[in-house]
Regions:
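Extended C-terminal regions of large enzymes
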Residues: 65, 80-250
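Basic, alpha-helical interaction scaffolds
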Residues: 1-60, 64, 72, 76-80, ...
Length: 250
């Protein structure tokens, strides 16, 4: 689940094949109008929803996956096949057809993963916590991964499942707060290096290179690379040499 890489295109092709195969089987069958939409909800949608906790497919791709189903089933339900999708996927209470929006269902599955497992203290919760703390060290900021601005610090994070969830939630203006330990500052007046770089308004490419240097040195704050009086950067940091710090987050 938390592996840095995923074969997303293969998964999209697999889901699209499920939808096309199901649509072809329905095309040749005889159905009553009032049976079509309940059939979609209870059969093909369940197959598509099965892996949604792990997929991070964007909304446009989900619409293309579901398109063969709607192209076949809407006419059978007495509805124009090109009926606006916003109405097709709207709930019955808002005079829609009530067909689940797969992108919304995917977000719901992700929120369930993020909220249910930590509350139940499952094994998956441990992996989530470890991954969040790894990202905390990687981005070097005082906020948890899901509370950061994606456009500012996404370039600093590895491409994991959590990063893709972060991007997805920000696209719909949602965030999830986790009670996870953050990076601590050992001195008064100290500051995290990444936040110093961001306050200096360096560009994204420079920020990425500075962060790589910070990760190589295994430091997080100004105090980690400065002299005891805080006035100068130690020679080892200039020369790219790691030092054994009295406190170590890595």
């Amino acid at each position: 689940m938390l592996a840095p890489l995923e074969n997303s295109q293969a998964h999209v092709d697999f889901l699209r094949n499920i939808a096309k195969t199901w649509a072809e089987s329905v095309r040749s069958g005889h159905l009553q109008k009032y049976d079509v939409i309940p059939l979609i909800k209870t059969t093909v949608m369940k197959s598509l929803e099965y892996s949604m906790a792990l997929t991070t497919i964007d909304e446009a791709t989900w619409r293309s996956i579901l398109s063969p189903v709607l192209q076949v089933c809407l006419p059978k339900a007495g509805v124009c096949r090109n009926f606006p999708r916003v109405v097709v996927m709207a709930p019955l209470s808002l005079q829609g057809l009530g067909i689940p929006n797969p992108f919304a269902s995917q977000i719901s599955a992700h929120l369930d993963m993020l909220l249910r497992h930590p509350a139940a203290r499952t094994e998956a919760a441990r992996y989530l916590e470890n991954n969040l703390q790894s990202h905390q060290l990687e981005t070097g900021t005082s906020f948890g991964l899901l509370q950061q601005d994606y456009s500012n610090t996404a370039i600093l994070a590895s491409n994991t499942w959590l990063k893709r969830i972060w991007r997805e939630l920000e696209s719909v203006d949602m965030y999830v707060a986790f009670d996870s330990p953050g990076l601590t500052l050992p001195r008064e007046g100290d500051a995290l290096l990444v936040e110093v770089f961001m306050d200096a308004e360096v560009d994204q490419e420079t920020l990425k290179w500075l962060n790589w240097c910070r990760l190589y040195l295994q430091v997080s704050s100004v105090a980690d690379i400065s002299t005891a009086d805080g006035k100068y950067i130690r020679q080892a940091a200039w020369e790219g040499q790691r030092e054994q710090l009295w406190r170590q987050s890595y």
